Regions:
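Active-site donor/metal-binding and catalytic loop motifs
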Residues: 323-325, 329-330, 419-437
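A recurrent flexible, glycine/aromatic-enriched loop bordering the glycosyltransferase active site
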Residues: 115-121, 343, 348-375
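Short, acidic, metal-binding catalytic loop of nucleotide-sugar glycosyltransferases
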Residues: 232-244
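Acidic donor-binding loop at a coil-to-helix junction in glycosyltransferase catalytic cores
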Residues: 395-404
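Short aromatic/hydrophobic "clamp" motif used to bind/position activated sugar donors
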Residues: 289
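Conserved donor NDP-sugar-binding/catalytic core segment of glycosyltransferases
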Residues: 303-338
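Glycine-rich, basic loop-to-helix element that forms the pyrophosphate-binding segment
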Residues: 268-283
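Phosphate/nucleotide-binding beta-alpha loop and adjacent structural elements of enzyme active sites
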Residues: 1-211
Length: 454
């Protein structure tokens, strides 16, 4: 598969909403030349979708017609019919994609063009409403609509009857973070999913998103607090901004509670954490996987953030950092992802009393750098394993997280990246913290493990 979006929008949409969806329908408003940073090209070329591309620039439209099988309209979309002045910007490179209707461009956008030294050419172009185009071509049921027109998005959407024209998923350019866009989409029956670059993703409230990531969790029979921790864990996953597939492994013949959703495995024997996680992998059916201890909590946007990084960077693995917490109540009070720069990396353990720190990791026999790790499921193919046998003789090939960074980067020659952010809270205790190693410099460790620092 060859994706063409600027920041992984097309792969995100495929994996989260349209896996296996062939023969769908798209609308691309502001399609430019149909190739450069196109959000719709992949769906037309690789998934057999049909649709409508709209582009007012004559030079870009000529290329669009040459490379795309879609219906291609050379017109500007707004909330009225007629003609208007359209500013074509040219600062070289890709800056023509910053062109737009003169009376809809944000003043900050014009300042940006000035800073770029962009040459401006004013064209008189035909203008039409989006629903006029949809009516003309009989497009009433639309899987995906991309609107990126440098400032006219809000007026176009205000004018569009979304009860008459059923659109499952939108990506909408919001270059300057106008809060009115989210308010409008909620009022029209859409749920905000996430922002990718400057595109905001919305899905229709009755259109389900597909889980892209399986989250593996071991539930220990000997943990006397497992019931409360399990409820907190399940609630934390349910609060993620994108859906996930939970997979729980219970050992010691412990029965899962009836209220627990997700996939469950019960093992009769006691398991190590690596045995439990790798047993859970047998049930994983999503492209991405991550582990999450029963007492740890993810930021509400953590799964979405790590997913888009994997897709944008075309990496096999991404790691982030945790905030160290010393009580379950503190751990449960999780915040959205934020920069790791505000918390120190402390290689020595324990830290000084009262120190708020983040979880680094080391190179000893246990632990990996970036303990909050999401990886592509296919990264397990060809990875070294050691064998663990179930009592009935079934052999499982398992891999602990000891070698994962070096296995992925050196043995499999795959790309691994580190997100320099706090993606959740890690429940720990100074006397038992295992992931810290003595005298490990953070940047040296990143270099040693072959990571790309984002």
């Amino acid at each position: 598969m060859k994706f063409s979006s600027q920041a992984g929008q097309d792969e995100f949409l495929l994996q989260n909403f349209f896996r296996g969806r062939r023969g769908g329908v798209f609308v691309d408003v502001g399609a430019y030349d149909g190739e450069k940073h196109s959000n719709s090209l992949f769906f037309e070329r690789d998934m057999g979708w049909r649709g409508l591309c709209v582009e007012p620039l004559p030079s870009a439209h000529a290329r669009l017609v040459a490379v795309r099988r879609s219906i291609n309209e050379q017109v500007c979309v707004a909330d009225f019919e007629g003609e208007a002045e359209f500013i074509e910007s040219d600062a070289g490179g890709e800056e023509r994609t910053l062109s737009g209707l003169a009376d809809r461009l944000d003043p900050r956008h014009l300042e940006r063009l000035d800073r770029l030294g962009a040459k401006r050419t004013v064209h008189r172009v035909p203008v039409t409403r989006l629903q006029t185009l949809l009516e003309r071509h009989g497009l009433y049921a639309i899987d995906y609509c991309s609107i990126d027109v440098q400032g006219a998005e809000l007026s176009i959407l205000k004018d569009l009857d979304l009860d008459r024209f059923k659109v499952s998923v939108f990506t909408i350019g919001n270059e300057y973070d106008d809060p009115r866009l989210g308010e409008l989409m909620r009022a029209k029956g859409y749920v905000f999913v996430m922002t990718i670059a400057k595109d905001q993703v919305f899905r229709r409230v009755d259109f389900p998103a597909l889980p892209l990531t399986s989250v593996l969790c071991a539930v220990w029979h000997q943990d006397t607090q497992r019931s409360d921790r399990l409820r907190g864990h399940a609630a934390n996953l349910a609060a993620q901004s994108v859906p996930v597939e939970p997979i729980y492994v219970f050992d010691g013949s412990d029965a899962p509670p009836e209220w627990l959703s997700g996939r469950k495995i019960v093992a009769h024997e006691r398991l190590t954490i690596y045995q439990a996680w790798n047993l859970a992998l047998a049930l994983a059916s999503t492209p991405f996987v991550m582990n999450l201890n029963l007492d740890d909590r993810l930021a509400p946007d953590a799964i979405a953030t790590l997913q888009i990084l994997l897709m944008r960077e075309q990496a096999a693995m991404v790691g982030g950092d945790w905030k160290i917490c010393y009580s379950q109540a503190e751990t449960d009070a999780v915040e959205p992802c934020y920069s790791a720069g505000g918390l120190p990396f402390v290689p020595q353990w324990p830290p000084a009393p009262g120190t708020t720190t983040r979880l680094g990791s080391g190179t000893g026999s246990r632990g990996t750098y970036g303990p909050a790790v999401m990886w592509r499921l296919d990264a397990h193919v060809g990875a070294p394993r050691y064998t663990w046998r179930l009592p009935e003789g079934t052999a499982l090939k398992v891999a602990g997280d000891t070698a994962w960074w070096t296995v992925v980067t050196e043995h499999l020659k795959r790309k691994a990246v580190r997100f320099p952010g706090i993606i959740g809270n890690y429940h720990s205790h100074p006397a038992t913290q295992a992931e810290f190693r003595q005298d490990v410099d953070e940047l040296a460790l990143i270099a040693q493990l072959g990571l790309s620092l984002l």
